[in-house]
């Protein structure tokens, strides 16, 4: 908070809270995946599992596209969403933050299919290792950017980069 500043941290929290509403688009599909995966696996139906994986990847990629479309509408109407309480530079920062957070969220939707698949295969060590690495790398990458004055945009850029790396890691692991 000291490196970011109270005003910029407040702006980050404000933008994050608005963008987080888009996470409701997932509609709890992850639990459904685990349910149907368990059913197909109990029946030794590998074809059913393959179709399930394809269907859920398609569903979550579609949700990502919807997220990006809704996010684009939000970015274009940023002044309407936040009203007149921000300065011009805060609007500019909020716009970049919103774009990055929307991309980050859009990446998490397809990643949830891979996370569910890894959970269904009970490969918890891999997931815990990724979480540990993310928690280790996040401050080591974010802190220098904050010290260099990149602010909340640098912080969210690191988060988005790490989300992308997690997605790629999960894809290759699956």
What does each model-identified segment do?
Residues 128-174:
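Hydrophobic alpha-helical transmembrane segments
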Residues 1-23, 52, 152-157:
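Interfacial/gating helices of multi-pass transporter permease domains
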Residues 68-88:
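Short membrane-interface helical motifs at transmembrane helix boundaries
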Residues 13-41, 57-67, 105-111, 165-169:
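Small-residue-rich midsections of specific transmembrane alpha-helices
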Residues 73, 86-111, 128, 132-137, ...:
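Alpha-helical transmembrane segments of multi-pass membrane proteins
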Residues 103-133, 150-153, 174:
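Membrane-interface junctions at transmembrane-helix termini in multi-pass inner-membrane proteins
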Residues 1-9, 79-86, 146-150:
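Helix-terminus/linker motif at the lipid-water interface of multi-pass membrane proteins
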Residues 13, 46-62, 70, 94-95:
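Interfacial transmembrane-helix starts/ends
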């Amino acid at each position: 908070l000291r490196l970011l500043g109270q005003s910029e941290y407040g702006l980050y929290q404000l933008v994050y809270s608005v963008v987080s509403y888009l996470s409701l688009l997932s509609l709890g599909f992850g639990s459904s995946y685990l349910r149907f995966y368990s059913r197909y696996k109990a029946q030794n139906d590998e074809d059913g599992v393959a179709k399930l994986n394809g269907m859920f990847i398609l569903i979550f990629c579609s949700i990502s596209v919807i997220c990006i479309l809704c996010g684009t509408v939000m970015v274009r109407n940023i002044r309407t969403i936040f009203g007149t309480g921000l300065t011009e530079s805060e609007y500019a920062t909020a716009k970049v933050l919103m774009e990055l957070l929307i991309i980050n969220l859009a990446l998490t939707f397809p990643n949830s299919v891979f996370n569910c698949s890894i959970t269904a295969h009970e490969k918890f060590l891999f997931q815990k290792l990724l979480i540990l690495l993310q928690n280790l790398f996040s401050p080591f990458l974010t802190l220098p950017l904050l010290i260099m004055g990149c602010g909340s945009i640098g912080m969210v850029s690191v988060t988005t980069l790490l989300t992308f790396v997690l997605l790629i890691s999960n894809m290759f692991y699956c």
